[in-house]
From Swiss-Prot:
Transmembrane segments: 57-77, 79-99, 120-140
Bilayer disposition of the protein: Multi-pass membrane protein
Name of the protein in its database record: Lipoprotein signal peptidase
Source taxon at top rank: Bacteria
Keywords: Aspartyl protease, Cell membrane, Hydrolase, Membrane, Protease, Transmembrane, Transmembrane helix
Entries under InterPro entries matching the protein: Peptidase_A8
Pathway: Protein modification; lipoprotein biosynthesis (signal peptide cleavage)
This protein's GO CC annotations: plasma membrane
Native organism: Caldanaerobacter subterraneus subsp. tengcongensis (strain DSM 15242 / JCM 11007 / NBRC 100824 / MB4)
GO biological process: proteolysis
HAMAP family hit by this protein: LspA
Subcellular location(s) of the protein: Cell membrane
Catalysed reactions listed for this entry: Release of signal peptides from bacterial membrane prolipoproteins. Hydrolyzes -Xaa-Yaa-Zaa-|-(S,diacylglyceryl)Cys-, in which Xaa is hydrophobic (preferably Leu), and Yaa (Ala or Ser) and Zaa (Gly or Ala) have small, neutral side chains
Length: 145
């Protein structure tokens, strides 16, 4: 099941980025709910909040190392554990952004909540939600088993 989650996250991420590039790049931004939620095309050459701009090789190396650690952890965990599914969400997001960095030299972002200081993408969402769930499990459910 974990491999299905990884594949789903990568597919959803890459498909939505394709749509963003095709439809948003020419117009820049589309207000879905004016002053609250926009779809805004951004080529992110750094990390969150614009940190470490133009460090593509650095991000590729870090992502590969983290990916290896995630895969190793997933192999060691029971196949059907919530921990495994959570790591699969994070791995899928990491792979989605890695594909962009290798293929394009930047990550396509497009989800733009006007009250939040950064534009992000589906991969980022799965990484953050996966990390929050993992943190919860580790703190309140007694660590990784």
């Amino acid at each position: 099941m974990a491999i299905v989650i990884v594949a789903f996250v990568v597919f959803l991420d890459q498909f939505t980025k394709y749509l963003a590039a095709k439809y948003l790049m020419p117009i820049g931004s589309y207000p879905v709910i004016k002053h609250f939620f926009h779809l805004t095309y951004v080529e992110n050459r750094g990390a969150a909040f614009g940190m470490l701009q133009n460090k593509t090789l650095f991000f590729i190396v870090i992502t590969v190392v983290v990916g290896i650690v995630l895969i190793y952890s997933m192999i060691k965990l029971p196949e059907n554990s919530l921990y495994n599914y959570t790591l699969a969400m994070i791995l899928g997001g990491a792979i989605g952004n890695l594909i962009d960095r290798v293929r394009l030299g930047y990550v396509v972002d497009f989800i733009d909540f006007k009250f939040f200081p950064a534009v992000f993408n589906v991969a980022d969402s799965f990484i953050v939600v996966g990390a929050i769930i993992l943190g919860y499990l580790m703190i309140f459910k007694g660590g990784i088993r």
